[in-house]
Amino acid sequence: MPEALDVLVTPTLTVLISGLVTIFGLMYVAGEVSSAIGTFADWLLSTGGAGAGFLLGGFFLPLVMLGLHQALIPIHTTLIEQQGFTVLLPILAMAGAGQVGAAAAVYLRLPRNESIRKTIRSAMPAGLLGVGEPLIYGVSLPLGRPFITACVGGAFGGGFVGLFNQLGDSVGSTAIGPSGWALFPLLDGNHGLGSTIAVYAGGLLVGYVAGFVATYFFGFSKALLAEFNVSQEPVPSTVAATGPAAASGGASAKEPAGV
């Protein structure tokens, strides 16, 4: 092929062939895989119920910590396309409820650590609205054990919502993104909005209580309390010279140096 034609034909054929393979091959396969994943997720929640919700709610905080929760977006979109709402998001949102309950317990267990308490006060409103990263990185993860007990709270909340899914009362969200209290306007289900809101609110309450109880009673060892339940504010140091030492010091300062 002449060089002048090669410059035009080769790139054109490359783009054309790769585009056709992507559109009619890879996209078709990806669509079938996404549909299968969505169907499996729906089957898992309808049959596994409380057990599936327990596992999903319990392991979601580590996914958020690593940023891997973004990989679930295709599953959410597939479920919304198939059913009109995703039943996965309300269960995963229970992890944030466990985190909020754990943070409240930390606040009470560390009354002398004003630094952590200030962080909790500033991050708690965001946590209630479903933004858990400030509480994760600022409170529970640095302490260690409260992060685990927060996962326990999320597991119980997820199990509660998953149980109702197994009983046929699906709780879903019509969009993805928010969680916590911010998810209430987006809730939808197969038994009416009132039932859906009641189940979701009950799951949040279970997550709050379970996260609080687990953290308050099992989230701190004696060594952890001894290390963190102290004031973090610097203590001003004052040097005062009193008594005979000060007097002798003053006298020696006035004496001339010997020759």
Predicted regions and their residues:
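Membrane-interfacial segments
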Residues: 1, 25, 29, 33, ...
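Hydrophobic, aromatic-rich alpha-helical transmembrane segments
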Residues: 4, 8, 12, 16, ...
